[in-house]
Design a protein with these regions (language model features):
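Short, Lys/Arg-rich amphipathic alpha-helical interaction segments
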Residues: 124-157
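Short, solvent-exposed interaction modules
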Residues: 56, 62-100
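A positional/architectural concept
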Residues: 2-42
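Short, structured motif recognition centered on aromatic/hydrophobic residues
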Residues: 16-20, 91-95, 118-120
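Residues immediately flanking
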Residues: 22, 51, 89, 97-99, ...
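A short beta-strand-loop micro-motif that forms or neighbors metal/cofactor-
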Residues: 29-45, 82, 101-129
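Short, charged/polar surface micro-motifs in flexible loops or helix N-caps
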Residues: 42-44, 53-56
Length: 157
Protein backbone atom coordinates (compact mmCIF):
# COMPACT_ATOMS: atom_id res chain seq x y z
CA UNK A 1 0.00 0.00 0.00
CA UNK A 2 1.42 3.32 -1.07
CA UNK A 3 1.65 6.22 1.32
CA UNK A 4 -0.81 8.77 -0.05
CA UNK A 5 0.23 12.39 0.40
CA UNK A 6 -1.47 15.68 -0.37
CA UNK A 7 -4.55 17.84 -0.05
CA UNK A 8 -7.21 17.95 -2.77
CA UNK A 9 -10.37 20.02 -3.12
CA UNK A 10 -13.34 18.26 -4.72
CA UNK A 11 -16.97 18.85 -5.63
CA UNK A 12 -19.56 16.43 -4.28
CA UNK A 13 -22.87 15.92 -6.06
CA UNK A 14 -26.27 15.55 -4.39
CA UNK A 15 -25.88 11.74 -4.43
CA UNK A 16 -22.69 11.97 -2.36
CA UNK A 17 -20.35 11.17 -5.24
CA UNK A 18 -17.02 12.85 -5.86
CA UNK A 19 -14.24 12.25 -8.36
CA UNK A 20 -11.26 10.61 -6.71
CA UNK A 21 -8.37 12.99 -7.42
CA UNK A 22 -5.90 11.99 -10.12
CA UNK A 23 -3.04 13.11 -7.87
CA UNK A 24 -4.09 10.49 -5.30
CA UNK A 25 -4.89 7.80 -7.86
CA UNK A 26 -1.35 8.06 -9.28
CA UNK A 27 -0.01 7.18 -5.83
CA UNK A 28 -1.96 3.91 -5.68
CA UNK A 29 -1.23 0.55 -7.25
CA UNK A 30 -3.00 0.30 -10.60
CA UNK A 31 -5.44 -2.34 -9.31
CA UNK A 32 -6.47 -0.50 -6.12
CA UNK A 33 -10.10 0.54 -6.48
CA UNK A 34 -11.66 -0.66 -3.20
CA UNK A 35 -11.77 1.63 -0.20
CA UNK A 36 -13.20 1.74 3.30
CA UNK A 37 -15.01 4.80 4.69
CA UNK A 38 -15.58 5.25 8.40
CA UNK A 39 -16.34 8.05 10.84
CA UNK A 40 -13.26 9.97 11.97
CA UNK A 41 -12.60 9.72 15.71
CA UNK A 42 -11.07 13.05 16.62
CA UNK A 43 -12.56 15.33 14.01
CA UNK A 44 -15.72 16.21 12.17
CA UNK A 45 -14.63 14.25 9.15
CA UNK A 46 -14.71 10.84 7.53
CA UNK A 47 -11.70 8.61 7.00
CA UNK A 48 -11.01 6.98 3.65
CA UNK A 49 -8.67 3.99 3.67
CA UNK A 50 -7.52 1.72 0.89
CA UNK A 51 -9.05 -1.69 1.50
CA UNK A 52 -5.65 -3.31 2.04
CA UNK A 53 -4.41 -0.66 4.48
CA UNK A 54 -7.64 -0.92 6.48
CA UNK A 55 -7.21 -4.68 6.78
CA UNK A 56 -3.68 -4.15 8.09
CA UNK A 57 -4.94 -1.53 10.57
CA UNK A 58 -7.62 -3.92 11.87
CA UNK A 59 -5.08 -6.75 12.18
CA UNK A 60 -2.75 -4.50 14.21
CA UNK A 61 -5.68 -3.43 16.36
CA UNK A 62 -6.67 -7.05 16.97
CA UNK A 63 -3.16 -7.84 18.19
CA UNK A 64 -3.25 -5.00 20.72
CA UNK A 65 -6.77 -5.43 22.09
CA UNK A 66 -8.52 -8.29 23.87
CA UNK A 67 -11.79 -9.10 22.12
CA UNK A 68 -13.15 -10.57 25.38
CA UNK A 69 -12.64 -7.32 27.31
CA UNK A 70 -15.80 -5.18 27.08
CA UNK A 71 -13.94 -1.87 26.71
CA UNK A 72 -11.60 -3.29 24.07
CA UNK A 73 -14.58 -4.82 22.29
CA UNK A 74 -16.23 -1.40 22.17
CA UNK A 75 -13.11 0.06 20.53
CA UNK A 76 -12.93 -2.78 18.00
CA UNK A 77 -16.60 -2.35 17.16
CA UNK A 78 -16.22 1.40 16.63
CA UNK A 79 -13.03 1.03 14.58
CA UNK A 80 -14.61 -1.51 12.24
CA UNK A 81 -17.96 0.28 11.83
CA UNK A 82 -17.24 1.10 8.22
CA UNK A 83 -18.44 0.81 4.63
CA UNK A 84 -16.63 -0.67 1.64
CA UNK A 85 -16.83 1.54 -1.45
CA UNK A 86 -15.37 1.17 -4.94
CA UNK A 87 -14.34 3.55 -7.67
CA UNK A 88 -16.90 3.56 -10.46
CA UNK A 89 -16.03 3.67 -14.18
CA UNK A 90 -15.60 7.47 -13.91
CA UNK A 91 -13.22 7.24 -10.92
CA UNK A 92 -15.90 8.46 -8.53
CA UNK A 93 -16.49 7.33 -4.97
CA UNK A 94 -19.86 7.55 -3.28
CA UNK A 95 -20.16 8.46 0.38
CA UNK A 96 -22.69 5.98 1.82
CA UNK A 97 -25.97 7.61 2.92
CA UNK A 98 -25.37 6.78 6.59
CA UNK A 99 -22.02 8.65 6.46
CA UNK A 100 -23.22 11.75 4.59
CA UNK A 101 -24.53 13.46 7.73
CA UNK A 102 -20.94 14.09 8.85
CA UNK A 103 -20.46 16.26 5.76
CA UNK A 104 -23.89 17.88 5.92
CA UNK A 105 -25.13 19.04 2.53
CA UNK A 106 -21.59 19.77 1.39
CA UNK A 107 -21.00 20.58 -2.24
CA UNK A 108 -17.31 21.25 -1.64
CA UNK A 109 -15.14 18.79 0.24
CA UNK A 110 -11.46 18.57 1.07
CA UNK A 111 -9.46 15.34 0.99
CA UNK A 112 -6.53 15.65 3.40
CA UNK A 113 -3.92 12.92 3.69
CA UNK A 114 -2.76 11.85 7.13
CA UNK A 115 -0.24 9.36 5.76
CA UNK A 116 -2.25 6.30 6.81
CA UNK A 117 -5.60 7.41 5.46
CA UNK A 118 -7.36 10.34 3.82
CA UNK A 119 -9.69 12.55 5.82
CA UNK A 120 -12.80 13.80 4.02
CA UNK A 121 -13.90 17.22 5.31
CA UNK A 122 -16.72 19.58 4.47
CA UNK A 123 -14.82 22.62 3.11
CA UNK A 124 -15.95 25.14 5.75
CA UNK A 125 -15.22 22.73 8.62
CA UNK A 126 -11.76 22.08 7.14
CA UNK A 127 -11.02 25.80 6.87
CA UNK A 128 -12.20 26.35 10.45
CA UNK A 129 -10.02 23.48 11.69
CA UNK A 130 -7.01 24.99 9.91
CA UNK A 131 -7.72 28.38 11.50
CA UNK A 132 -7.10 26.72 14.86
CA UNK A 133 -3.52 25.62 14.13
CA UNK A 134 -1.81 28.96 14.75
CA UNK A 135 0.20 27.35 17.53
CA UNK A 136 1.42 24.48 15.33
CA UNK A 137 5.11 25.12 16.08
CA UNK A 138 4.40 24.94 19.82
CA UNK A 139 2.34 21.78 19.38
CA UNK A 140 5.03 20.08 17.27
CA UNK A 141 7.67 20.99 19.84
CA UNK A 142 5.50 19.70 22.69
CA UNK A 143 4.70 16.39 20.98
CA UNK A 144 7.89 15.77 19.00
CA UNK A 145 10.56 18.01 20.55
CA UNK A 146 13.69 16.16 21.51
CA UNK A 147 12.89 13.19 19.29
CA UNK A 148 15.80 13.50 16.89
CA UNK A 149 16.38 9.86 15.94
CA UNK A 150 15.41 9.06 12.39
CA UNK A 151 13.60 5.77 11.78
CA UNK A 152 15.50 3.05 9.98
CA UNK A 153 14.35 2.02 6.50
CA UNK A 154 12.56 -1.02 7.97
CA UNK A 155 10.56 1.15 10.40
CA UNK A 156 8.85 3.06 7.59
CA UNK A 157 6.91 0.04 6.35
Amino acid sequence: MALILGTEYCKMDSNGRFKFPTAFKKQLASDESRFVIRQGFTAECLELWTFDSFQIEVQMLSKRLNEFDLEDRKIIRQMTRANIVELDSNDRLMVPPERKSVLGNAKEIVLQSTGKCIEIWERNAYDKMNDNVDDLAELVNKRLGGQHELPSAGDAE
